[in-house]
Amino acid sequence: MKQTVLQNNLQNLLESAENILLLQGPVGNFFLRLADWLTANGKTVHKFNFNAGDDYFYPPTQAHTVVFNDSYDAFPEFLQEYIAQHHIQAVVCFGDTRPYHIIAKRIANENQASFWAFEEGYFRPYYITLEKDGVNAFSPLPRRADFFLEQFPKLAQQEYKAPTPVRGGFTPMAKNAIRYYIELFRNPNKYPNYIHHRASNAGHYLKLWSISILKRLNYYIEDIQIAKRVEAGKYGKFFIVPLQVFNDSQVRIHCDFPSVRSFLLHVLSSFAEHAPADTNIIIKHHPMDRGFIDYWRDIKRFIKEHPELKGLLVKKKFRPSEKHFRRPEAINILATAM
């Protein structure tokens, strides 16, 4: 049987396009570094900036950088003309559900330009995902498990190489995010028509990020202790339910539930009714959501409505805090509010 070696999507992008347009990237200088890499590989890289935060991490003085400060309604025609004029063959963005990126995907497809989207890594840590045509629920990846079982024997066996660790974690990401929003709100007149994909109020973010930092510091020691208990198997058999950021596109666009809260309560209800008596459930609150949403009130209300459960608030390492619920007859619910 002839075996196949899969190319990664970054290599596919590199080989399929000479003129590449970058839209908004993740907070930080990732797209600037990507542009440098593409340029070093002989590509002509164009970039659209939509706000002053974009300008800070990708200076408009970079070659082929365009300041788009027209109205949102003018964007489709502007993009169409730009693609035609500069012979753009690939459009690249981070997140395929931002307002401008939704339009960009349609315009790219109409003009025979490929559309590529980066996303937080499907595999973590140390990875970022890149897919053609869309990510998450828009991903072209097959949904059938048997597809992968059928394809695996056809793939050439390769030696696993662990990814190079990336320095940092939460702190550098938070610094980049704070800097981005400071720039965005400090100079709104340059981009008076910009539409952000999340709340666009500086005070809103400052207050809630401050709460997140305080919670992180407050829970630090207890997080380490809980992590050791989990690793030592103190909680026995358990299911784990990771929660998404409350306003993430996965929730707003792709989720079958109207909110993370409704999903959480559904899971707790199902677990309380159907779980084996010797199992626990750990619900992980997203680390970026700690200052924005506190699900502990919902969980306490749930426990009150189900007197067979009682709860004790604890915390968890890695991400936020953890809530542990114990049933007298031995059903345990470990929920994390990271």
Region locations from a protein language model:
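N-terminal beta-loop-helix "entrance" segment that forms/cooperates
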Residues: 53-70
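A donor-sugar binding/catalytic signature common to diverse glycosyltransferases
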Residues: 90-102, 316-338
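A short helix->loop->beta-strand "cap" motif at the edges of active sites that frequently abuts
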Residues: 110-115, 279
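Nucleotide-activated donor-binding/catalytic signature segment of Leloir-type glycosyltransferases, i.e.
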Residues: 296-316
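Short N-terminal targeting/anchoring amphipathic segment
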Residues: 18-23, 82-98
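Conserved catalytic-core segment of nucleotide-activated headgroup transferases in glycan assembly
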Residues: 41, 191-299
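Active-site-proximal region of nucleotide-activated glycan assembly enzymes
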Residues: 114-216
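N-terminal subdomain of nucleotide-sugar transferases
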Residues: 1-51
